[in-house]
Structure formats: C-alpha cells, structure tokens
Amino acid sequence: MCERSLYRAGYVGSLLNLQSPDSFYFSNLRPNGGQLAALPPISYPRGALPWAATPASCAPAQPAGATAFGGFSQPYLAGSGPLGLQPPTAKDGPEEQAKFYAPEAAAGPEERGRTRPSFAPESSLAPAVAALKAAKYDYAGVGRATPGSTTLLQGAPCAPGFKDDTKGPLNLNMTVQAAGVASCLRPSLPDGLPWGAAPGRARKKRKPYTKQQIAELENEFLVNEFINRQKRKELSNRLNLSDQQVKIWFQNRRMKKKRVVLREQALALY
C-alpha cells in the first residue's frame, strides 16, 4: 500500500547522479559551505524527500494553507473541537482537554492517549481525618479509636507500653499512672499536695498581731518612728515576736504614715 520502492528516482537518482529538472538545492555546495571543484555537482531531486513524495492515501489531511515553501509541510494544531481559551487559573475541565499537538512533532497516539497519574482524591483521606478528629475530641473513648489513631499512638517516641495502658477509659481528673507515659512527663508531685503548689519549701503560715502587740508597737512608734537594734530586741522579747517581725512592722507603719500625709496634702490643694 504505502511502501516506498527502492527503484524510485528519489533513491536511485541520488546514487547514480541523475539530473532532474525539478531539483531546487544548490548543487555545488558542501555541507560545511565549501565547494568541490573536482567532483561533478550532485543534486537532490524533490522526489528524494520522503515527506514530499508520500502518496495521497497515506498523507494526513492538512488544511489548504499548511503546505508552503516548496512542498514542506508546516506543523499545525489539530484538535477535534475549537481551541479552548481558558485562563491559567481555570479548573473546569481536565488539563488534557486544552492541549493540542502537531502531527509531526507529537508522540504516537499510544503515548498521547495515556493520562497523567492524578493525585489521591480527598475522599480517600476522609478516614484519616475522621480518625484524627476522634482522637482529638473523644477523650473517654480512646480504646474505641479507629485504626488510624492507633498508628498515631504507636508512633509516639515513648510508647513501648503506652498502647497497653490506653486500652481503658482515660480519666483527666486523676494523675497519670502509666509507666510508659511517666518517662515522658514531668516528675509527679508527692501525694497530698495540690497541683499549684511547688515541690520546694512550704510557705510559712501568717501569724496576725494581737491587739496588745499592736498597741505596744503603736506607742513605741509615737515615741520614735525609727527604732534601733537594742530597742527592737527589747520589744521582740516583751511582745513574744521575732526581730524580723518588729522590723517589718515599723517599715510598714512608716509607709502608711507617708501615704496619709500625701493624701492630706493632695486634698488641701484641691
């Protein structure tokens, strides 16, 4: 049908140096631009070009303006429908619908028919998302979590025994007793101490002054606002107070007097 014969002028003529009236190449030019003086000119007839001598039954259908420049076929866009003028951000159709290929430069129909592997749809990610939501909000049902959440528990850095410890219901009001989780958390507080208390030294309970002690200290303050060490020692022994308590009381009493004086001065100005 479309087999090319070796006896055609395009093949035999180039070997036997047969002149053809329809040759259009420069006959005396070498490929590198030089000229051979000793050899006779060799011409390549138009029939030697395989794309120009293809029978009409094997040639693809081309538009009228596609053949130009002495029989050379120009690449053209072949599409079954009109050209799609969609913007780059349009996502109404698949990407393959907006592509057009030239028949000479494109790949075979088998390669063009292959579709690019697409990403996994969002529906396949729904079980994993549901598992994460169940593990995030369902604290009482950790044992009933989906397999996706079980894999998350298995991937914890300190989870050799964490999987077995979380089979039962989790109570947030109690301290964690799991041995596998204890290594990942802070050291637990001693039993009986509240969560807000520090494990260090307990704060000393405040001992309020009695009315008799306050009266004695007020009388001494009226005599002298600043007390020396000897007088402070006498007051602490007589009132059954420590030296630090007497010192702090005098400091607070001086600050209270200063605030009262400043308030009176402010009221006098206005």
UniProtKB/Swiss-Prot annotation:
Write down the InterPro entries for this protein, in alphabetical order.
Answer: HD, HD_metazoa, Homeobox_CS, Homeodomain-like_sf
A GO CC annotation given for this chain: chromatin
Tell me where it mainly resides. nucleus
A GO term (biological process) for this protein? Answer: skeletal system development
The molecular function terms of the Gene Ontology recorded here are: DNA-binding transcription factor activity, RNA polymerase II-specific; sequence-specific double-stranded DNA binding
Note whether Phosphoprotein occurs among the keywords: no
Q: Which residues bind DNA?
A: 202-261
Q: Name one Pfam family in it.
A: Homeodomain
List all disulphide bridges recorded for this chain.
Answer: none
Q: Does the keyword Transcription regulation apply?
A: yes
The cross-references to Gene3D superfamilies, in alphabetical order and at most eight, read: Homeodomain-like
The alphabetical list of record keywords is:
Developmental protein, DNA-binding, Homeobox, Nucleus, Transcription, Transcription regulation
List every stretch annotated Disordered.
Answer: 102-122
Q: Where in the cell is it found?
A: Nucleus
Give the UniProt family note.
Belongs to the Abd-B homeobox family.
Q: What does this protein do?
A: Sequence-specific transcription factor which is part of a developmental regulatory system that provides cells with specific positional identities on the anterior-posterior axis.
**UniProt name for this protein:** Homeobox protein Hox-D12
